[in-house]
A protein has these predicted regions:
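Rossmann-fold dehydrogenase core element
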Residues: 105-122, 142-147
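C-terminal helix-rich "cap/oligomerization" subdomain common to oxidoreductases
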Residues: 7, 66-69, 223, 290-330
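Active-site loop of classical SDR/Rossmann-like NAD(P)-dependent oxidoreductases
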Residues: 274-286
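N-terminal Rossmann-like dinucleotide-binding module
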Residues: 1-47
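Hydrophobic residues in well-ordered beta-strands that form the structural core
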Residues: 53, 91-92, 117-119, 230, ...
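Beta-loop-alpha module in the N-terminal Rossmann-like domain of NAD(P)-dependent dehydrogenases
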Residues: 16, 47-109
Length: 330
C-alpha cells in the first residue's frame, strides 16, 4: 500500500479523494494537513487519517511514500520543495507553480532529492484524448499543422465565493492560469513539440470583481511547426458546435467533443469512435500509483508542468506588451 499525505483539504481534494477510494487496494491517504483546523479534522475523520494543521509537521512525523498537493496556487512551490526535501514523491494540482524562479526551485528540488513529481493533469485521462494521441503518433493525419483546444463555461462565482482566485497575487493571474491551464496542457500533449512563443488577448466580460481576466484566447507556436489556438472562459458557454479539441494535419483532421472522436482524411476515409467516459480523477490517481509501483515516468512530470507554465507566462507577457513573447527556458 502506497501511503499518501494530503496537503490541502479544500474543494478539489474531494475529487482526489474519490480517486483514492477507486484504488484503495493500491494507494490511500493516511494523513491530511490543512491550515484550517476544522477542515483538517473533518477530512481526517472522513478518511480515517491523522490530521495536521502544518504539512511540515506531517512530513516530519508520518511514514509517507508520497504527498498530494491540493493547495491554492501560490503555495505550490513551497509545498513541493518541502516534500522533495523530505524524500516524498509528489502529485501536485495545477498549476505546478507561478513564476520562472519558482519553476527553477521545483526542478532543482525534485532532481536533487530523486523524487517523482506528477502533475495532476486529469484531462489527459479522457479516453478521447488518449485515442487522439494514438492516432496522431500513428501518423493517421500526417504531419500536424494546427491544434485547437477549448474549455469554457458559465462560472457563477461572486466576490463572496471567489476567495483567493479573485487575487492575481494568489492565483497567478486570472482564468487563463486556472481553468485555462487545462486546454494548455492538452495543447502541449497533442502538439508533440516544445513551445517557443505565445501571445494572448485577455478579456473581462462579466466577472468584473476579479483582478485578472475571466476569458482568454491564446496563440502558441511549437518547435515542430505546430500552431496552437486556445479559447477559455468563465464568462460564457461555448457555442453548441464548438469542439473540445481538434488537430489538422497534411492528410486530414480529427476532432472531439470530449466523449466521441472522429477523423476525416483527404482520401475520403472517415471513422468515429464512441468512447465510454471515465472519472478522470480516478484514472489519474491510478496512474500515479502505478508510476510509483513500477518506478516509471508519469504521463506529465515537472518538465511538462514547466512547459505549460512557460506558455502561460508568455501569453500574459504577449498580452501585456502587445507582442508575440518567447517562452522562457527554465
Amino acid at each position: 500500500m502506497i501511503k499518501v499525505g494530503l496537503i490541502g483539504g479544500g474543494g478539489i481534494a474531494s475529487a482526489h479523494i474519490k480517486g483514492y477510494r477507486g484504488h484503495a487496494d493500491k494507494i490511500g491517504i493516511t494523513a491530511v494537513a490543512d491550515a484550517v483546523e476544522e477542515t483538517a479534522k473533518a477530512r481526517g475523520e472522513e478518511l480515517g487519517a491523522t490530521p495536521y494543521t502544518d504539512y511540515r509537521e506531517m512530513l516530519a512525523n508520518e511514514d509517507l511514500d508520497a504527498v498530494d498537493i491540493c493547495l491554492p496556487h501560490h503555495l505550490h512551490r513551497d509545498a513541493i520543495v518541502a516534500a522533495a526535501e523530505a524524500g516524498r514523491h509528489i502529485l501536485c494540482e495545477k498549476p505546478l507553480c507561478l513564476t520562472a524562479d519558482e519553476a527553477a526551485d521545483v526542478r532543482a528540488a525534485v532532481t536533487e532529492h530523486g523524487v517523482t513529481l506528477m502533475c495532476a493533469h486529469n484531462q489527459l485521462f479522457m479516453p478521447t484524448v488518449a485515442k487522439a494521441k494514438e492516432l496522431i503518433e500513428a501518423g493517421t493525419i500526417g504531419t500536424v499543422y494546427e491544434v485547437r483546444t477549448t474549455d469554457s463555461f458559465y462560472n457563477d462565482f461572486d466576490p463572496s465565493s471567489m476567495g483567493w482566485r479573485a487575487s492575481s497575487k494568489t492565483s497567478g493571474g486570472g482564468e487563463l492560469i486556472d481553468t485555462g491551464y487545462h486546454p494548455t496542457y492538452l495543447m502541449l500533449h497533442l502538439a508533440g513539440g516544445l513551445p517557443v512563443e505565445a501571445t494572448a488577448m485577455l478579456s473581462t466580460h462579466r466577472l468584473k470583481f476579479m483582478e485578472g481576466e475571466d476569458s482568454a484566447q491564446v496563440l502558441i507556436k511549437f518547435d515542430n511547426g505546430v500552431v496552437g489556438q486556445l479559447v477559455t472562459s468563465w464568462a460564457y458557454e461555448p457555442a453548441a458546435s464548438t469542439e473540445r479539441f481538434s488537430a489538422v494535419g497534411e492528410l486530414g483532421s480529427l476532432h472531439s467533443d470530449g466523449t466521441s472522436l472522429s477523423y476525416r482524411l483527404r482520401s475520403g476515409e472517415t471513422e468515429t469512435f464512441e468512447l465510454e467516459s471515465v472519472d478522470t480523477f480516478v484514472a489519474e490517481i491510478g496512474h500515479f500509483a502505478e508510476s510509483l509501483r513500477t518506478k516509471s515516468r508519469p504521463i506529465h512530470t515537472e518538465e511538462e508542468g514547466i512547459a505549460v507554465l512557460g506558455i502561460l507566462l508568455a501569453a500574459y507577457e504577449g498580452s501585456r506588451s502587445k507582442t508575440i513573447a518567447p517562452v522562457l527556458k527554465v
